[in-house]
Regions:
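Catalytic, metal-anchored helix/loop core of enzyme active sites in primary metabolism
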Residues: 1-116
Length: 116
């Protein structure tokens, strides 16, 4: 599924054999480096903050990636834009679905307006 997502809309065949999980029954995961993977750190921060912050993080991320794909940002500016958007927002802890949609829309508009 990951390969299909990365090569969408085409379905590129892998030159490697499929992983047989009945044979490879043990996988090891390392703790992620949150300094290197700043967006993951920001996602953890949004979850820890709670309330409407995850919706803000999502909205900012969508705009940051879109702006990167348009050539408006460098890859390394993506987490900076997300962080600036999250820092500018006042979280609601009692919220409705409408509040989540508004938070996402606010973050999208704010992230679109930020200049580097």
């Amino acid at each position: 599924p990951i390969q299909y997502a990365l090569t969408y809309p085409k379905r590129v065949q892998s030159p490697f054999p499929r992983v047989d999980f009945s044979v490879r029954s043990h996988l090891t995961f390392e703790k992620p480096d949150l300094d290197t993977f700043r967006c993951l750190s920001l996602a953890y921060c949004a979850l820890k903050t709670g309330g409407t912050m995850p919706a803000v993080m999502n909205g900012a991320n969508e705009i940051a990636v879109a702006r990167f794909l348009k050539g408006e940002l460098t890859f390394l500016q993506i987490p900076s834009l997300i962080e600036r958007t999250m820092d500018a927002y006042t979280v609601k802890y009692k919220y409705t679905l409408e509040d989540l949609l508004e938070a996402d829309a606010w973050a999208s508009a704010y992230a679109q307006s930020v200049r580097f």
